[in-house]
């Protein structure tokens, strides 16, 4: 066994954990990654943008990731009959604009995780232990000890990194209970994620709508020579969003370029105590029953498709949207990365981008100061804190969920009218949908190994 002063435990095998492990290994650490789940990840689409794209290039993974993207060609709002209210908003901003409704890299979380895990596991000084949790942690002056569930034995490390998401076990085990409690900032937005089969009857109208406007569709692998989508595709490459009153919305998006599967999102904006309780403690059966009751009355084909798909989905996941906010991302020799330390929530679209950037900076600072982790962890916070704060800002002054999921029929009419205006005029391309303004400058050589 390697000396504990070069051995790091990363708890969590998602994007944050796998990227952290990759760069720590490049920096000369021996890395153990513990991942509690051995099952299929739920079907959530994630975005990679800005500085995070530069980091995946450094990892040599850009082309593989681009080859695995969903192929989403844009997003459209549909009416109560499931018909587009206006042409889709695409992906290509005009000069002077920063808008991109569908991001540069849109990929399913499970696909991105596999790519990052494969890259980390290929390194000789990274070990993944699946079906394993961290049960106990004890801090010492020059090391930190963890009891891992797969052996039940204490093991010594120089540091433990919590890359274990919103409900981070490392945060709970190493941070003051009151600090941990106050770190969770809930919203009144709820979402269920799951996948459904593609359906060929949805492709033709989308292909016709996209054909006259090839500038909306830069996804060349999906388009014919005139810019229209391949009529042989199995389902539309366009995301579709339908609304109903009481703050409800259904969003269906591509999972892959062939259209054989779709990701589905049932969204609710509500102060309902029943929603809060079922999201927190309800069984999956309770959650599906509640959502069935809320969404079954949707008119048009989208509601029926979504509700029926929810009941047969094997990757269903329902949650209340929360953010994690802390004044420090470390406690002793334990540090947090990604959602565990600073989740911006899906409302910002920044979660995966933050996780990748955070993993790179954390590993870089640890490689620079392996014998002074207090300095490394403090620098990590100082470098990223302003960027994280910006990334956690929910669009439209925090009102985005209320605007996107109106409570009244009048509000839905206004939203659809606004969508028609920005779609037909093209002014959406001049809007800013949350692109980076705070720049992250650090570069690390990881001992010349990157």
Curated annotation (Swiss-Prot):
Keywords assigned: FAD, Flavoprotein, Monooxygenase, Oxidoreductase
SUPFAM superfamilies assigned to the protein according to its UniProt record, in alphabetical order: FAD/NAD(P)-binding domain
Coiled coil residues, start to end: none
EC number, UniProt record: 1.-.-.-
A molecular-function term among this protein's GO annotations: monooxygenase activity
Pathway membership, UniProt: Mycotoxin biosynthesis
Phenotype seen when the gene is deleted: Abolishes the production of cercosporin. Leads to yellow-brown mycelia with significant export of colored compounds into the agar.
Stretches that traverse the bilayer: none
First-level EC class: oxidoreductase
Induction: Expression is positively regulated by the cercosporin cluster-specific transcription factor CTB8. Expression is also affected by nitrogen and carbon sources and pH, and is also controlled by another transcription activator, CRG1, previously shown to regulate cercosporin production and resistance.
InterPro entries assigned to the protein according to its UniProt record, in alphabetical order: FAD-bd, FAD/NAD-bd_sf, FAD_aromatic-hydroxylase
Family according to the record: Belongs to the aromatic-ring hydroxylase family. KMO subfamily.
Function: Monooxygenase; part of the gene cluster that mediates the biosynthesis of cercosporin, a light-activated, non-host-selective toxin. The perylenequinone chromophore of cercosporin absorbs light energy to attain an electronically-activated triplet state and produces active oxygen species such as the hydroxyl radical, superoxide, hydrogen peroxide or singlet oxygen upon reaction with oxygen molecules. These reactive oxygen species cause damage to various cellular components including lipids, proteins and nucleic acids.
Name assigned to this protein: Monooxygenase CTB7
The organism of origin for this protein: Cercospora nicotianae (Barn spot disease fungus)
Encoding gene per record: CTB7
């Amino acid at each position: 066994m390697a000396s504990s002063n070069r051995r790091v435990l990363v708890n969590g095998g998602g994007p944050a954990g796998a990227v952290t492990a990759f760069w720590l290994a490049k920096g000369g650490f021996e890395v153990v990654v513990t991942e509690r789940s051995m099952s299929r990840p739920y079907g959530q689409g994630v975005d990679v943008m800005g500085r995070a794209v530069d980091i995946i290039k450094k990892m040599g993974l850009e082309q593989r990731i681009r080859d695995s993207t969903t192929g989403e060609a844009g997003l459209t709002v549909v009416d109560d009959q499931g018909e587009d209210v206006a042409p889709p908003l695409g992906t290509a901003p005009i000069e002077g604009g920063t808008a991109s409704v569908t991001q540069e890299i849109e990929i399913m979380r499970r696909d991105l995780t596999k790519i990052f895990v494969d890259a980390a596991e290929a390194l000789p000084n990274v070990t993944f232990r699946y079906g394993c949790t961290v049960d106990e942690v004890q801090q010492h002056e020059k090391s930190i000890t963890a009891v891992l569930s797969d052996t039940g034995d204490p093991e010594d490390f120089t540091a433990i990194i919590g890359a274990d998401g919103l409900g981070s076990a490392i945060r709970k085990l190493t941070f003051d209970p009151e600090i941990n409690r106050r770190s969770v900032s809930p919203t009144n937005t709820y979402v269920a994620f799951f996948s459904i089969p593609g359906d060929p009857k949805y492709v033709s109208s989308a292909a016709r709508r996209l054909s006259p406007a090839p500038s909306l569709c830069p996804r060349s692998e999906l388009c014919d020579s005139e810019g229209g989508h391949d009529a042989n595709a199995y389902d539309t490459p366009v995301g579709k969003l339908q609304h109903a009153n009481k703050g409800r919305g259904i969003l269906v998006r591509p999972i892959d370029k062939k259209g054989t599967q779709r990701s589905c999102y049932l969204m609710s904006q509500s102060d309902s105590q029943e929603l809060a309780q079922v999201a927190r403690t309800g069984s999956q059966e309770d959650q599906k029953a509640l959502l069935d009751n809320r969404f079954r009355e949707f008119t048009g084909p989208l509601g029926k498709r979504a509700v029926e798909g929810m009941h047969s989905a094997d990757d269903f996941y329902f949650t209340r949207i929360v953010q994690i906010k802390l004044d420090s991302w470390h406690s002793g020799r334990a540090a947090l990365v990604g959602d565990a330390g600073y989740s911006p929530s899906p409302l910002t679209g920044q979660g995966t981008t933050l996780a990748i950037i955070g993993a790179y900076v954390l590993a870089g600072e640890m490689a620079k100061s392996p014998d002074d982790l207090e300095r490394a962890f403090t620098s990590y916070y100082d470098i990223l804190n302003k960027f994280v704060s910006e990334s956690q800002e929910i669009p439209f002054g925090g009102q985005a969920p209320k605007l996107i999921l109106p409570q009244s029929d009048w509000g839905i009419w206004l939203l659809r009218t606004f969508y028609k205006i920005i779609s037909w005029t093209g002014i959406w391309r001049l809007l800013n949908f949350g692109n980076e303004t705070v720049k992250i400058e650090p570069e690390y050589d990881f001992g010349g190994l990157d």
